[in-house]
């Protein structure tokens, strides 16, 4: 059982973003996880940890994550600043070339955490150097279940403005790297601020809303990002050898909750 959070977009505490308080919304998210999912094995936050890469915002993130009762692992996104992030979270592993890529060995299988950031750009990048690391890890673990985690999606999702800031041409490189490995069970990513699921070259994928603002389902948005105040969410993924179940929880939902005995259904 794992938790995915994405696109927290923290600003220095007390600073709003799009009319919302990113710190408070993340704290509420963590309170919900602690209350209902303290038995989860770990939590992965798939990038855009802060909105502007502020040192103070990363410090706030570290302080907030101290409240989380389960282990966590962090990915960077296009809104993050690698150097400042590494100063505040120096324990985050890097690959031999300095990218924030790591391999986690878990009871469910191998988790590969990828770095898709192109510094200073909203779109992603996955260069040959990073792809060689990924291929080496896939070769090393070719007889085990593998789960991929990244910030940018390696394909278009049908919202034109978001598709312009995906992995673009480097998506082909990722596909060429993973196409021969049938043991990849699922792909988790962030960046799009929407609940989206499907299959990419036979690999099931899911993504979800961020903890602050969201992107409206506007399939015609081309030269603007249609931000909304749709509810934030986190995902609960149940990983087993023969199936992957992904639940999405709108943790700010306060609608009526009624327990109905099964005997009376």
Describe these PLM feature segments.
Residues 11-14, 51-56, 78-85, 119-122, ...:
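Active-site environment of divalent metal-dependent phosphoester hydrolases
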Residues 15-21, 90-91, 120, 160-166, ...:
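Short glycine-enriched, charge-decorated loop/helix-capping segments at active-site entrances
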Residues 1-60, 157-160:
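N-terminal active-site segment of His-dependent metallophosphoesterases
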Residues 29-42, 123-206, 228, 236, ...:
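His/acidic metal-ligating clusters that form di-metal
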Residues 208-219:
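His/Asp/Glu-enriched short active-site or ligand-binding loop at hydrolase and phosphoryl-transfer sites
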Residues 1-12, 108-118, 147-150, 203-209, ...:
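Active-site-proximal beta-strand elements of phosphoester/diester hydrolases
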């Amino acid at each position: 059982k794992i938790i995915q959070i994405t696109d927290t977009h923290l600003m220095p505490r007390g600073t709003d973003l799009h009319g919302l308080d990113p710190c408070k919304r993340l704290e509420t998210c963590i309170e919900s996880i602690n209350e209902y999912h303290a038995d989860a094995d770990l939590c992965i936050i798939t990038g855009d940890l802060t909105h502007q890469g502020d040192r103070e915002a990363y410090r706030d993130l570290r302080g907030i994550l101290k409240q989380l009762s389960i282990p966590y692992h962090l990915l960077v996104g296009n809104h993050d600043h690698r150097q400042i992030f590494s100063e505040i979270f120096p324990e985050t592993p890097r690959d031999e070339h300095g990218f924030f890529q790591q391999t986690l060995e878990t009871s469910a299988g191998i988790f590969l955490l990828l770095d898709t950031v192109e510094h200073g750009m909203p779109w992603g990048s996955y260069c040959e150097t990073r792809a060689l690391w990924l291929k080496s890890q896939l070769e090393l673990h070719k007889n085990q279940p593998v789960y991929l985690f990244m910030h940018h999606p390696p394909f278009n999702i049908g919202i034109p403005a978001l598709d312009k800031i995906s992995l673009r041409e480097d998506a082909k490189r990722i596909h060429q790297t993973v196409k021969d490995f049938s043991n990849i069970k699922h792909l988790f990513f962030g960046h799009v601020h929407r609940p989206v699921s499907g299959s990419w070259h036979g690999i099931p994928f899911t993504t979800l809303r961020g903890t602050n603002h969201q992107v409206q389902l506007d399939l015609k948005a081309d030269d603007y990002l249609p931000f909304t105040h749709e509810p934030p969410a986190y995902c609960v993924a149940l990983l087993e050898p023969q199936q992957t179940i992904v639940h999405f929880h709108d943790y700010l939902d306060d609608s009526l909750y009624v327990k109905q005995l099964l005997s009376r259904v």
